[in-house]
């Protein structure tokens, strides 16, 4: 049975892939759950058109990501002001959302807080820090910022 996937299925494919599966798997699992549609000539042409549009959109997104990466590289004076104790320890921590707001306040581009990578842990003391930003699948930038006492 030939089907066009509408959702990512492990060990089978991604949305838009044309796959050949056993009739029972297609009829009893993929089609009822909406994970696939029957492959017809019209549907195959529609999938090809969608893939072309997605490729064009991916190229535009990559170009925009390169522009944002350049803006971040030229950005200076990013500082996050937080309340601290006398010894420089923060009351709380600096999170990705705080960094994104500081970038915008410094005249930089607006960033999604989920794209800022703080996997090493949140910042808990004053000083200079650097975090990575995922702008596109294979385009990453860096934000240098300083945590200062309020």
Swiss-Prot record:
UniProt-recorded Gene Ontology molecular function terms: rRNA binding; structural constituent of ribosome
Keyword Chloroplast: no
Keywords: Ribonucleoprotein, Ribosomal protein, RNA-binding, rRNA-binding
Signal peptide: none
Any Gene Ontology CC annotation: ribosome
UniProt record, GO biological process: translation
Recorded superkingdom: Bacteria
Protein role: Binds to the 23S rRNA.
Family of this protein: Belongs to the bacterial ribosomal protein bL9 family.
The protein, known as: Large ribosomal subunit protein bL9
Species this protein is from: Corynebacterium kroppenstedtii (strain DSM 44385 / JCM 11950 / CIP 105744 / CCUG 35717)
């Amino acid at each position: 049975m030939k089907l066009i996937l509408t959702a990512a299925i492990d060990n089978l494919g991604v949305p838009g892939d044309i796959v050949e599966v056993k009739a029972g798997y297609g009829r009893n699992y993929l089609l009822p759950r909406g994970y696939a549609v029957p492959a017809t000539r019209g549907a195959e042409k529609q999938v090809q058109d969608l893939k072309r549009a997605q490729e064009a959109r991916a190229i535009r997104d990559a170009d925009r990501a390169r522009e944002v990466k350049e803006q971040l590289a030229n950005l200076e004076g990013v500082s996050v002001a937080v309340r601290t104790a006398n010894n420089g320890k923060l009351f709380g921590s600096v999170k990705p959302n705080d960094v994104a707001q500081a970038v915008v306040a410094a005249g930089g581009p607006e960033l999604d807080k989920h794209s800022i990578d703080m996997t090493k842990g949140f910042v808990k003391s004053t000083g200079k820090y650097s975090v990575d930003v995922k702008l596109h699948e294979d385009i990453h930038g860096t934000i240098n910022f300083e945590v200062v006492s309020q």
